[in-house]
Amino acid sequence: MAGYEYVSPEQLSGFDKYKYSALDTNPLSLYIMHPFWNTIVKVFPTWLAPNLITFSGFMLLVFNFLLLTYFDPDFYASAPGHKHVPDWVWIVVGILNFAAYTLDGVDGKQARRTNSSTPLGELFDHGLDSWSCVYFVVTVYSIFGRGPTGVSVFVLYLLLWVVLFSFILSHWEKYNTGVLFLPWGYDISQVTISFVYIVTAVVGVEAWYEPFLFNFLYRDLFTAMIIGCALCVTLPMSLLNFFRSYKSNTLKHKSVYEAMVPFFSPCLLFTLCTVWILWSPSDILEIHPRIFYFMVGTAFANITCQLIVCQMSSTRCPTLNWLLLPLLLVVAAVIVGAATSRLESALLYTLTAAFTLAHIHYGVQVVKQLSRHFQIYPFSLRKPNSDULGMEEQNIGL
C-alpha cells in the first residue's frame, strides 16, 4: 500500500492541461482581506514554499481542536454549573483561528509571488480546506456547548452537515462549470468566529446565556446564521452560477445524472450516519459526539478530495467512495441489533481510526505522485532531479 497510486494516468494527463479559474465576488474579501493579505505576504521570505504555509495554517486548526478537546471533551464546559474553559484558551483559539485564515489567504499569493503555482498547490489547499470544515464547526461549538443554553449534539450534527454541503457545493459548481466561485460565507464566518472567540475571553461564556433580542438566545443566532448563509447565499449563488453556465452552453456534463454524481457519496454518508444515530442502542452521538463528528468530517474530506482531483483533471467523479462500505456494514450491524452498546463504541473508534489512516494515506500518496509528476518538492521551492525527489519524499515521510 505504501506505493499505491490513487491518481490514474488519465487524471495525470488532465492535470497537465489544467488552468486555474476562480471568481471571488465577496466585498469583504475583495476590499478588506485581499489588501491585508497582499501586505502580509511580503513578510514571508521568497524561499518559503506555499504548501508549507498552507499546511501550517491547517495544523493551527488541528491544534485548536485538540486544545478544546482537552478542556471541553464532551461540550459541557460552557454550560451553567460546569467548569468553564479558561479565558486564555479562547484568546489563543481566536488568534490561531485568524492566523490560520490569514495563512489560507496568503498561500496562493506566495505561489504567484515566487512563480511556483502548480495544480498540486491548489489541490493541497482545497483538500486541507475540506478537512478543516469539521475543525471549524466542532471548535466553535464549545462556545455554546450542549447545556440548557446551548444546542443539542444532534442539532450540531445537522449544522455540521449544512457547512459540509455548503463547502462541497462550490466544488460541484466547478466540476460542472469549470470555474470555482469562491463562497461568500467562508470569509464572513472566519472573521466573525475569530472575533467571537476573543469576545468570549473578555466577557465569559455566561454572556451568551442572555437573550440578545426578543428572547432569542445567541445560540439561536448562531444556528440561524449558519442555516441562513447556506440557504440565502451559498445555495442560490451556486444554482445561479450553474444556470448561467447552462444558458451559455458551457456545462462540462450535459446529463442531469452526470452533473449530480458528486452528490451521491456525500448523501449516502449523511444517510448512513443519520440512520446510525437514530437506531443506535447506546445513543452513540450523545456518548461520543466529538468522535462521531470527526468521523463524519474525515470521511467527507476524503469524498471531497476525490471530487477535487476529478474536477481539476476533467475526469468523471466516482459514484461511490469505498470508505462508505465499512460504514454500511457497521450501520447494518446496528440496525439488526448485532452491536451491543460497548461494541458500538468500539466500532465507532475503530471506524474513525481507519478513516483517518485511510485519508492520510490517500493525501500522502496523491501529493507524492503529483510531486513526481510535476518534478517538484511539495514543501520546498528547490528544483529537484528525479533521484533527489525520491530521497526527499522518504525523508519527509511521503
From Swiss-Prot:
Domain of life from the UniProt record: Eukaryota
EC numbers: 2.7.8.1
Catalyzed reactions: CDP-ethanolamine + a 1,2-diacyl-sn-glycerol = a 1,2-diacyl-sn-glycero-3-phosphoethanolamine + CMP + H(+); 1-O-alkyl-2-acyl-sn-glycerol + CDP-ethanolamine = a 1-O-alkyl-2-acyl-sn-glycero-3-phosphoethanolamine + CMP + H(+)
Protein's membrane topology: Multi-pass membrane protein
Gene Ontology biological process terms, A to Z: ether lipid biosynthetic process; myelination; phosphatidylethanolamine biosynthetic process
Task of the protein: Ethanolaminephosphotransferase that catalyzes the transfer of phosphoethanolamine (PE) from CDP-ethanolamine to lipid acceptors, the final step in the synthesis of PE via the 'Kennedy' pathway. PE is the second most abundant phospholipid of membranes in mammals and is involved in various membrane-related cellular processes. The enzyme is critical for the synthesis of several PE species and also catalyzes the synthesis of plasmanyl-PE, a lipid required for proper myelination and neurodevelopment, from 1-alkyl-2-acylglycerol.
Name by which UniProt lists this protein: Ethanolaminephosphotransferase 1
Biological source species: Mus musculus
Taxonomic path: Eukaryota, Metazoa, Chordata, Craniata, Vertebrata
Gene: Selenoi
